[in-house]
Amino acid sequence: MARQTPITRYRNIGISAHIDAGKTTTTERILFYTGVSHKIGEVHDGAATMDWMEQEQERGITITSAATTCFWSGMGNQFPQHRINVIDTPGHVDFTIEVERSMRVLDGACMVYCAVGGVQPQSETVWRQANKYKVPRLAFVNKMDRTGANFFRVVEQMKTRLGANPVPIVVPIGAEDTFTGVVDLIEMKAIIWDEASQGMKFEYGEIPADLVDTAQEWRTNMVEAAAEASEELMDKYLEEGDLSKEDIIAGLRARTLASEIQVMLCGSAFKNKGVQRMLDAVIEFLPSPTEVKAIEGILDDKDETKASREASDEAPFSALAFKIMNDKFVGNLTFVRVYSGVLKQGDAVYNPVKSKRERIGRIVQMHANERQDIDEIRAGDIAACVGLKDVTTGDTLCDEKNIITLERMEFPDPVIQLAVEPKTKADQEKMSIALGRLAKEDPSFRVHTDEESGQTIIAGMGELHLDIIVDRMKREFGVEANIGKPMVAYRETIKKTVEQEGKLVRQTGGKGKFGHVYVRLEPLDVEAAGKEYEFAEEVVGGVVPKEFFGAVDKGIQERMKNGVLAGYPVVGVKAVLFDGSYHDVDSDELSFKMAGSYAFRDGFMKADPVLLEPIMKVEVETPEDYMGDIMGDLNRRRGMVQGMDDLPGGTKAIKAEVPLAEMFGYATQMRSMSQGRATYSMEFAKYAETPRNVAEGIIAKFQAGGKKGDDE
């Protein structure tokens, strides 16, 4: 089967934004105008097509990025048909992992901002992620029909808050309830959408007289931005004082692809205005898979040679599994982005991360949660495969004759954990299956069993993250469970270098045990080293035989899992085995493993041990009247205020760093202090030393036989 759409007419885009900027509604409209969905779904009724998990519809927020394929030929059918793969990404900080994950597989992004709220904290997080993956993007200012809407203020905020370089190619006609359409600065005509056809039809008209000057000023700004793309365009502009439509589009496109500018549009998705022009901009300014840098990976050879894969059907097959979802009808769905080559139904693929080959059962193209079976996928495609058993998020799938491992995704460690206990014996097995599946879908969610208490501990990126996991466990898998209080994921580390002996000698009749080591423990800078633990040996003259080095390392690592101070995992330690002795008959692996463990346990307590706690970056937006109370409350929570910004409408944004331990129940307290008018967002910033008075309480509880984490 030949390719239906040339790869140059593909656009793989993500739509991402702050909560409530109207992102899901925008995506809904895209599906409506491109003819995929015949009834517009409204988030207000809980019927939006992209928000297809029940929890999303109830909470009105998007949690999992659904991938959808649609086709567009332009508002006035002025383009050949293009295929647009849209990935809807969540806007809540607890789900930043989903955004990070989709940024990896996108070629371009559309950032949606609220015309009233402007650039909010989450917008900055998403912007940083897009910068990290060098994703070309355009901006769409939504909700132009809302009271307080101001397009030009958002343009300013993009410059000041994001350090962006926005170039509007439309300006709004009216705002709030007088918002009727936009002036297209490239055509220099007004676009008015027909309300009866829900915006399917539109007409070009004259620019309203009171907008002519504004439109001219912003057009000049746009043409200058386009002219800066090349010397040739600049010369043309200086000679003629203007550029043709084709030159403007070519110039803006070149600069958008280089991430030098962000083309900016506006509209109201809810009122069916502006999204159509934004779709045209996706075709005009965002890259096809052939226009972004070829994906890089590592070949399967001794030297781990770096290589790249061109976006072409002729190249060997390579793809990245960027999302795994459980579907109650077909089982595991693995979403893949194909970078090169062709994959047909029934083909075998190789997963170099797991060293396994698997056969593809079915291939389906998703439209939100409806699926269509297809026979093959080619370079540039995004689709889901059915029947892959051992693939986890971030794995590479490739041709087994041309093995390549694409760059892995990085997933942050969880900062909050809680205990879950099944209510009945029957729930026990269901719970472990459910948690296993959910952890496979979401790499920022972890599950482990606490060795001392035997409890199942789940860990994630925030309270909302874990709430939703527990909720899904109940709904999708029918598991009834009791939920413990949230606990902070503390860590332990050392501040000075020590040398310590560790010895195990047992003489009982027959073969005894003998292991004897000297270990040096040194503080390790986790950020600089890029790892939490390092083992080295400086043994001279075979005083400890080589075959026992691994056992010593293992003994230390096992002891680090449940730290010495308060039972929390130890990080930031370099252990060096430098001396010891052995016995010809009695020495074995177990003896040296125990000796290593003892040396670590005793040395750790002498090396200035400290407890580390997760510190969160908190941003509170509050009306000025409540600022004093909110600042005072943050200080009481051991918060450090980092700065303040003035927002429109007498609102202040307070940025602070606050220990996670002090943030439980913050939402309720903040609401009552501000009569429900303040909002906040929170994301993990770093680990820092816990103040002595706080740490002493946690350690005393642990030593008195209390369970770790009972820091309430």
Swiss-Prot record:
Domain of life from the UniProt record: Bacteria
Pfam families in the cross-refs: EFG_C, EFG_III, EFG_IV, GTP_EFTU, GTP_EFTU_D2
Domain tr-type G: 8-290
Keyword Metal-binding: no
Signal sequence coordinates: none
Cysteine-cysteine disulfides: none
Main localisation: cytoplasm
Residues annotated for GTP binding in this entry: 17-24, 88-92, 142-145
Keywords: Cytoplasm, Elongation factor, GTP-binding, Nucleotide-binding, Protein biosynthesis
Cellular localization per UniProt: Cytoplasm
Listed GO MF terms: GTP binding; GTPase activity; guanosine tetraphosphate binding; translation elongation factor activity
UniProt keyword Protein biosynthesis present: yes
Gene3D superfamilies registered for this protein in UniProt: 3.30.230.10, 3.30.70.240, Elongation Factor G (Translational Gtpase), domain 3, P-loop containing nucleotide triphosphate hydrolases, Translation factors
GO process terms (BP): ribosome disassembly
Residues annotated as transmembrane: none
Any single GO CC term annotated in Swiss-Prot or TrEMBL for this entry: cytoplasm
Role according to the record: Catalyzes the GTP-dependent ribosomal translocation step during translation elongation. During this step, the ribosome changes from the pre-translocational (PRE) to the post-translocational (POST) state as the newly formed A-site-bound peptidyl-tRNA and P-site-bound deacylated tRNA move to the P and E sites, respectively. Catalyzes the coordinated movement of the two tRNA molecules, the mRNA and conformational changes in the ribosome.
NCBIfam families reported in the protein's UniProt record: EF-G, PRK12740.1-5, small_GTP
Similarity field: Belongs to the TRAFAC class translation factor GTPase superfamily. Classic translation factor GTPase family. EF-G/EF-2 subfamily.
UniProt protein name: Elongation factor G
Lineage: Bacteria, Pseudomonadati, Pseudomonadota, Gammaproteobacteria, Moraxellales
Gene that this polypeptide is encoded by: fusA
